[in-house]
């Protein structure tokens, strides 16, 4: 069950939101295959762009769309490695980290969108696999991609104008506490996502608890946002 009981006001707002979503879903069903494909690609690219820019990547949605188009033409798992020089030459070398983040996020979200149902029940192996996909093109992450953190991490707010720093979140320490917390989280999720009448609330609590653990050395924010989508796709609510 959820760690909280939804208020009547919240349940009313959820019903209103669900009604809006149902109407949107009905409209989407009327689209032609070409229009539906365009809309899906637009949402996919926007998701990648927004999620990586939060982490200070600098590629615009237009540039993300261009990279996605280049990689779609190839379609192989080695597409980025084979096209990396061409992509960086077009987007300037100083954007290399941003490109690597975008391509990794694209890989992870592709898995989420295309295999959501097959990824249920959720396991720690699946979560670590998505993390590996996210960071697979970032060479500096080679030693920790797909593995839980081995050193403490924290979320810090930095005011770049004043230099002031403030700790926003003190996550679980590495080791047995993190691994136990992740095992508990996965078990809780699998027991609730298809039983609770409000999948949106389960998705929200899952991501909150995931970020409270902050199980990986890097990429927790992007992975958490991907998990939000995954949980909704894995629910029994077709809308």
Where are these regions (language model features)?
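FIC/Doc superfamily catalytic core
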Residues: 1-239
């Amino acid at each position: 069950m959820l760690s909280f009981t939804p208020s009547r006001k919240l349940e009313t707002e959820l019903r209103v939101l669900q009604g809006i979503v149902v109407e949107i879903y009905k409209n989407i069903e009327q689209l032609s295959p070409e229009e539906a494909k365009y809309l899906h690609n637009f949402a996919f690219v926007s998701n990648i762009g927004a999620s990586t820019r939060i982490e200070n990547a600098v590629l615009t949605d237009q540039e993300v769309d261009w990279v996605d188009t280049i990689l779609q033409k190839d379609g192989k798992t080695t597409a980025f490695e084979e096209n990396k020089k061409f992509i960086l030459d077009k987007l300037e070398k100083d954007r290399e980290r941003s490109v690597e983040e975008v391509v990794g996020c694209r890989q992870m979200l592709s898995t989420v969108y295309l295999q959501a149902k097959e990824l249920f029940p959720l396991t720690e192996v699946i979560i670590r696999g998505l993390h590996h996909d996210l960071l697979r093109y970032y060479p500096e992450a080679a030693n920790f991609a797909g593995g839980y953190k081995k050193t403490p991490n924290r979320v810090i707010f930095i005011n770049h104008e004043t230099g002031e720093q403030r700790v926003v979140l003190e996550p679980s320490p590495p080791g047995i506490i993190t691994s136990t917390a992740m095992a508990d989280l996965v078990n809780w999720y699998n027991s609730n996502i298809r039983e609770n009448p409000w999948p949106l609330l389960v998705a929200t609590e899952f991501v909150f608890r995931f970020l409270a653990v902050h199980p990986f050395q890097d990429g927790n924010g992007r992975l958490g946002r991907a998990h939000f989508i995954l949980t909704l796709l894995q629910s029994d609510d077709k809308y």
